[in-house]
Amino acid sequence: MKIYILGAGAIGSLFGGLLANAGEDVLLIGRDPHVSAINEKGLKIVGIKDLNVKVEATTRVPEEKPDLIVLATKSYSTIEALKSARHIVKGSWVLSIQNGIGNEDKIIEFGGKAIGGITTNGAMVEAPGVIKWTGKGVTIIGLYPQGKEKFIEKVADVFNSADIETHVSENIISWIWAKAIVNSAINPIGTLLEVKNKVIRENDFLLSMAMEVVKEGCRVALQNGIEFDVPPMDLFFQTLEQTRENYNSMLQDIWRGKKTEVDYINGKIVEYAKAVNLEAPMNLLLWGLIKGKEALEGKK
């Protein structure tokens, strides 16, 4: 399968590297110095697996369309990425494996055929051309917002053959919301206190607060017509257990002096609450506190 990874950061490079290693025709689209390092020495994957993969990388979007575009940018870069790839997005299958709510809607606005996706795999860029696979997780994909499609079954088969455990859902929008709700509770609390995820699980005050954030997100989702395949509270406890030793991605962004994705997680939950005349005070508070922390960190 001819696959372009649009946004060759940590997760994008991990998926692209594993797919290329399995013999798929992969092109990583990203930024220097990461792209240059991959073209010079190959893509090195360390951690869960140790691989050195020969894979093509570029900073420019090609003219030719692939079979599948995997969108793996940060959510705040979605529009910029889709604009740069407008000529290949239109009429093409585009799979989002991003955090947050609303990325798939943007794909549709640009004329793409949207496949929703979530992944619990963990990865980080250790150095240009080097990706650390920090946690082996599960990927769930499906026709957005709901439904069946034979091509998506084929994508899942390709991913599974590349050691990316993948399942297909006919209700992918519910998984996107469920993951966003879990992230809305764990990420801001872990970021504000600068602690590993296990601290939230082990501290009664933090755990009860995080659980209230999950409940609030569920109320907003249900009022917006989302029907969950799996209760987000179950996913919340499962995530805390599986990522006990992790510093969450929002905190890692803050430490690197980068913008976080809070606007597309807590911010979106607040936005959807307003749309159905609900209030989401805990999400509103966490959203504001993270935006404040972003601004303060930026001034250091």
From Swiss-Prot:
Q: Which Pfam families match?
A: ApbA, ApbA_C
> Which PANTHER family does the UniProt record give?
2-DEHYDROPANTOATE 2-REDUCTASE (PTHR43765:SF2), 2-DEHYDROPANTOATE 2-REDUCTASE-RELATED (PTHR43765)
Q: Which reaction does it catalyse?
A: (R)-pantoate + NAD(+) = 2-dehydropantoate + NADH + H(+); (R)-pantoate + NADP(+) = 2-dehydropantoate + NADPH + H(+)
According to the UniProt entry, its GO molecular function terms are: 2-dehydropantoate 2-reductase activity; NADP binding
Read off the InterPro entries from this record: 6-PGluconate_DH-like_C_sf (IPR008927), 6PGD_dom2 (IPR013328), ApbA (IPR003710), Ketopantoate_reductase (IPR050838), KPA_reductase (IPR013752), KPR_N (IPR013332), NAD(P)-bd_dom_sf (IPR036291)
Any idea what job this protein has? Catalyzes the NAD(P)H-dependent reduction of ketopantoate into pantoic acid.
What do the Gene Ontology cellular component annotations say?
cytoplasm
The source's domain of life comes to: Archaea
Protein name, UniProt field: 2-dehydropantoate 2-reductase
Species lineage: Archaea, Methanobacteriati, Methanobacteriota, Thermococci, Thermococcales
Gene this protein is translated from = apbA
Q: Which annotated residues bind substrate?
A: K179, N183, N187, N197, N246, Y247, N248, S249
